[in-house]
Amino acid sequence: VKLTTPAATQKMTATFTGDVLMTPIATGETPSRVGVALVRFTPGARTHWHVHPMGQVLHVTDGTALVGTRDGAVVRARAGDTVVCSPGEEHWHGATADAFAAHLAIHESADTADGGTSPVTWLEPVSDEDYQRAQA
Protein backbone atom coordinates (compact mmCIF):
# COMPACT_ATOMS: atom_id res chain seq x y z
CA VAL A 1 0.00 0.00 0.00
CA LYS A 2 1.31 3.42 -0.86
CA LEU A 3 -0.06 6.95 -0.60
CA THR A 4 0.46 8.96 -3.77
CA THR A 5 0.13 12.64 -4.59
CA PRO A 6 -1.72 13.53 -7.81
CA ALA A 7 0.37 15.07 -10.57
CA ALA A 8 0.03 18.75 -11.39
CA THR A 9 -3.21 19.89 -13.02
CA GLN A 10 -2.84 20.58 -16.73
CA LYS A 11 -4.88 22.80 -19.03
CA MET A 12 -5.83 20.59 -21.96
CA THR A 13 -5.78 22.17 -25.41
CA ALA A 14 -4.69 19.91 -28.28
CA THR A 15 -7.57 17.42 -28.14
CA PHE A 16 -10.29 19.47 -26.43
CA THR A 17 -12.62 22.33 -27.33
CA GLY A 18 -13.06 25.02 -24.64
CA ASP A 19 -11.44 25.22 -21.22
CA VAL A 20 -10.65 21.84 -19.70
CA LEU A 21 -8.44 21.01 -16.70
CA MET A 22 -7.09 17.53 -16.09
CA THR A 23 -5.52 16.27 -12.87
CA PRO A 24 -3.89 12.84 -13.21
CA ILE A 25 -4.92 10.98 -10.02
CA ALA A 26 -3.13 7.65 -10.33
CA THR A 27 -1.40 5.24 -12.67
CA GLY A 28 -1.21 1.59 -11.78
CA GLU A 29 2.10 -0.09 -11.08
CA THR A 30 3.37 -2.64 -13.61
CA PRO A 31 1.85 -4.93 -14.72
CA SER A 32 -1.28 -2.78 -14.29
CA ARG A 33 -2.09 -0.44 -17.16
CA VAL A 34 -4.90 1.47 -15.46
CA GLY A 35 -5.00 5.25 -15.29
CA VAL A 36 -7.36 7.61 -13.46
CA ALA A 37 -7.77 11.36 -13.96
CA LEU A 38 -10.13 14.06 -12.71
CA VAL A 39 -11.29 16.10 -15.70
CA ARG A 40 -13.11 19.43 -15.26
CA PHE A 41 -15.01 21.12 -18.08
CA THR A 42 -16.27 24.71 -18.28
CA PRO A 43 -19.67 25.24 -19.94
CA GLY A 44 -19.48 24.26 -23.61
CA ALA A 45 -16.14 22.46 -23.25
CA ARG A 46 -15.69 18.94 -24.58
CA THR A 47 -13.20 16.37 -25.81
CA HIS A 48 -12.54 15.64 -29.46
CA TRP A 49 -13.85 12.38 -30.84
CA HIS A 50 -11.69 9.55 -29.54
CA VAL A 51 -11.57 5.83 -28.92
CA HIS A 52 -10.16 3.71 -26.10
CA PRO A 53 -8.99 0.26 -27.24
CA MET A 54 -9.69 -1.17 -23.77
CA GLY A 55 -12.77 0.97 -23.05
CA GLN A 56 -13.30 3.81 -20.58
CA VAL A 57 -15.35 4.40 -17.44
CA LEU A 58 -16.53 7.93 -16.59
CA HIS A 59 -17.84 8.67 -13.09
CA VAL A 60 -19.45 12.12 -12.90
CA THR A 61 -18.47 13.97 -9.72
CA ASP A 62 -20.05 17.39 -10.32
CA GLY A 63 -22.62 18.91 -12.65
CA THR A 64 -24.05 17.19 -15.70
CA ALA A 65 -21.83 15.61 -18.35
CA LEU A 66 -22.75 14.69 -21.91
CA VAL A 67 -21.33 11.57 -23.56
CA GLY A 68 -21.99 11.21 -27.29
CA THR A 69 -21.38 8.38 -29.77
CA ARG A 70 -21.02 8.29 -33.57
CA ASP A 71 -24.56 6.98 -34.02
CA GLY A 72 -25.91 10.18 -32.45
CA ALA A 73 -26.80 8.67 -29.07
CA VAL A 74 -26.16 11.00 -26.13
CA VAL A 75 -26.11 10.09 -22.45
CA ARG A 76 -26.79 12.89 -19.96
CA ALA A 77 -25.03 11.83 -16.76
CA ARG A 78 -25.40 13.66 -13.45
CA ALA A 79 -23.19 13.71 -10.36
CA GLY A 80 -23.04 10.17 -9.01
CA ASP A 81 -23.75 8.52 -12.39
CA THR A 82 -21.24 6.24 -14.12
CA VAL A 83 -20.99 5.79 -17.90
CA VAL A 84 -19.18 2.83 -19.49
CA CYS A 85 -17.76 3.33 -23.00
CA SER A 86 -17.12 -0.01 -24.70
CA PRO A 87 -13.70 -0.89 -26.12
CA GLY A 88 -13.33 0.59 -29.61
CA GLU A 89 -16.42 2.83 -29.34
CA GLU A 90 -15.83 6.30 -30.83
CA HIS A 91 -17.20 8.89 -28.43
CA TRP A 92 -16.77 12.32 -26.87
CA HIS A 93 -17.68 13.80 -23.50
CA GLY A 94 -17.93 17.20 -21.87
CA ALA A 95 -20.11 19.76 -20.13
CA THR A 96 -23.49 21.04 -21.17
CA ALA A 97 -23.59 24.44 -22.89
CA ASP A 98 -24.66 26.25 -19.72
CA ALA A 99 -23.03 24.46 -16.77
CA PHE A 100 -19.74 23.09 -15.49
CA ALA A 101 -19.09 19.34 -15.28
CA ALA A 102 -16.40 17.11 -13.79
CA HIS A 103 -15.75 13.39 -13.94
CA LEU A 104 -13.23 10.77 -13.05
CA ALA A 105 -11.94 9.12 -16.23
CA ILE A 106 -10.69 5.56 -15.81
CA HIS A 107 -8.95 3.72 -18.64
CA GLU A 108 -6.48 0.97 -19.41
CA SER A 109 -3.62 1.22 -21.91
CA ALA A 110 -3.27 -1.25 -24.79
CA ASP A 111 -0.22 -2.33 -26.77
CA THR A 112 0.60 -0.22 -29.83
CA ALA A 113 2.21 -1.21 -33.14
CA ASP A 114 5.46 0.57 -32.20
CA GLY A 115 5.90 -1.56 -29.08
CA GLY A 116 4.57 1.02 -26.62
CA THR A 117 1.21 1.39 -24.91
CA SER A 118 -1.57 3.96 -25.19
CA PRO A 119 -4.99 4.37 -23.57
CA VAL A 120 -6.53 6.46 -26.36
CA THR A 121 -6.52 7.36 -30.05
CA TRP A 122 -7.59 10.95 -30.67
CA LEU A 123 -9.70 11.87 -33.70
CA GLU A 124 -11.21 15.11 -35.05
CA PRO A 125 -13.02 17.81 -33.02
CA VAL A 126 -16.74 17.39 -32.35
CA SER A 127 -18.55 19.80 -34.68
CA ASP A 128 -20.57 22.63 -33.19
CA GLU A 129 -23.62 21.13 -34.92
CA ASP A 130 -23.14 17.72 -33.28
CA TYR A 131 -22.55 19.39 -29.91
CA GLN A 132 -25.69 21.55 -30.22
CA ARG A 133 -27.80 18.48 -31.12
CA ALA A 134 -26.57 16.84 -27.91
CA GLN A 135 -28.10 19.63 -25.82
CA ALA A 136 -31.69 18.51 -26.55
Language-model features: where?
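Short, conserved beta-strand element in jelly-roll/cupin
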Residues: 38-42, 51-67, 106-109
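A short hydrophobic beta-strand segment most commonly corresponding to one strand
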Residues: 57, 84-85, 98-121
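Short acidic-glycine-tyrosine-enriched beta hairpin
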Residues: 71-88
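A short, N-terminal "cap"/entry segment at the start of jelly-roll beta-barrel domains
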Residues: 1-34, 119-136
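Short beta-strand His + acidic residue motifs that chelate non-heme Fe in jelly-roll/DSBH
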Residues: 47-49, 67-68, 85, 90-97
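Membrane-topology and secretion signals of cell-surface/extracellular proteins
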Residues: 11, 18, 47, 110-111
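Conserved short histidine dyad/triad with adjacent acidic residue
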Residues: 22-24, 35-52, 87
